[in-house]
Amino acid sequence: MSAINAEPLPITGKTLLSIKIIKIDLKDASQYLDPFMTVAVRDSNEIPLSASQDTPVASRKADSEIVFNKMVHIQKAIESLPPGFAIFFEFKHYKPKKRNISTKCWAFIEQDELKEGDLALEM
């Protein structure tokens, strides 16, 4: 697992992006072991544009929600990313019987969907 990177230093005239991952709602949320989110920036051919980042394990699990409440800082300025890039979010958890980490679901935001403020993604 790779950790969340620190916020990059500001660059004059460039736009930096930080995304707060608050929670994910799943009907069987309490059953997932060591759940976390992986965030990756990829080009239009799904080629990684920077190293992926993993949130720490969720801070809380309830009946139908898993709470992360973590900020992820994209390490490149928006202007330096190629047209058509997207930010991918993968919900992962540990499966003890198989002794591996599994991806349960994922979603992505395309470049033209980025905006300031809250955004809910369907995974």
Task: Tell me what each language-model feature is.
Residues 17, 35-37, 70, 87, ...:
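Hydrophobic residues positioned within well-ordered beta-strands of beta-sheet architectures
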Residues 64-101:
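Eukaryote-biased detector of low-complexity, proline/serine/threonine-rich segments
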Residues 1-41, 74-79:
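C2/C2-like lipid-binding beta-sandwich modules
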Residues 47-63, 69, 104-106:
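Short Trp-Ser/Thr-centered turn/loop motifs at beta-strand boundaries
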Residues 8, 86-123:
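C2-type phospholipid-binding modules
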Residues 26-31, 40, 44-49, 80-83, ...:
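Eukaryotic short linear interaction motifs
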Residues 10-14, 43-47, 61-66, 80-83:
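Helix-boundary capping/turn motifs
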Residues 50-58, 73-78, 110, 123:
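Low-complexity, flexible helical/coil segments
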